[in-house]
């Protein structure tokens, strides 16, 4: 029984490693040739495996794309939420949030391109573009941002404002940089990050008069 269990665990580990390899190849393919041209054959080529092997781990291209999207979002979310633990005040957490969101994408450009390719090109079985879908659940990063804004108001660090509106504005400013190649070319990540924090630091700061 022990040998059978060890064999099963080894097979499970190998299968998971192969799935991760295929997802990484999918990210690279989306970055290099875009969603429209990202066939299973192209993905297999970059993974260094046969095309049928992908079908062993994923039911079809849509399944692979959805799993890749889940991976992209979970990795980015984990990075930001882990960094937020470094802050002790709401203001510090706001700075860290902005820095972390921008820094992660700045150091994971392929992941950012792959995410954009999926969101703006993939469709549901009902032919609805992914970017038009409403969120079924709470986004961990948005939740973390709204929580730190709420904490800031409760502690008196931040003025009174609508939490959802402010969180949306902050997310929008971050997303604008990540999606605008011209802006990226003329404004450094560090400069944009500093300016965005300055803007929202002033926008959220409590009136001390």
Put a short name on every predicted segment:
Residues 32-36, 87, 108, 155:
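Short coil/turn segments at alpha/beta junctions that flank glycine-rich nucleotide-binding fingerprints
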Residues 83, 99-106, 116-124, 153, ...:
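Helix-loop "lid/cap" segments that line or gate small-molecule binding pockets
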Residues 18-26, 43, 68-72, 76, ...:
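Generic hydrophobic, amphipathic alpha-helix propensity
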Residues 18, 22-30, 101, 200:
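Short hydrophobic clusters on alpha-helical segments that form packing/core surfaces
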Residues 21, 29-63, 67:
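Helix-turn-helix
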Residues 1-6, 96, 103, 139-155, ...:
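C-terminal peripheral helix-coil segments that are non-catalytic and often amphipathic
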């Amino acid at each position: 029984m022990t040998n059978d269990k060890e064999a099963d665990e080894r097979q499970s580990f190998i299968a998971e490693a192969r799935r991760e390899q295929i997802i990484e190849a999918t990210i690279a393919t989306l970055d290099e040739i875009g969603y429209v041209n990202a066939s299973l054959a192209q993905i297999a080529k970059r993974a260094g495996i046969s095309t049928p092997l992908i079908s062993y781990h994923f039911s079809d291209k849509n399944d692979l794309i959805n799993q890749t999207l889940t991976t992209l979002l979970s990795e980015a979310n984990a990075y930001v939420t882990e960094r937020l633990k470094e802050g002790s005040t709401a203001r510090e957490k706001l700075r860290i949030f902005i820095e972390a969101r921008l820094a992660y994408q700045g150091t994971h450009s392929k992941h950012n391109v792959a995410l954009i390719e999926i969101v703006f090109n993939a469709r549901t079985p009902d032919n609805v573009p992914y970017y038009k879908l409403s969120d079924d659940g709470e986004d961990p990063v948005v939740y973390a941002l709204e929580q730190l804004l709420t904490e800031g108001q409760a502690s008196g660090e931040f003025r009174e404002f609508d939490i959802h509106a402010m969180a949306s504005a902050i997310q929008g400013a971050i997303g604008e940089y990540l999606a605008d190649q011209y802006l990226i070319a003329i404004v450094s990540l560090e400069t944009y990050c500093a300016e965005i924090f300055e803007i929202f630091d002033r926008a959220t700061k409590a009136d001390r008069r």
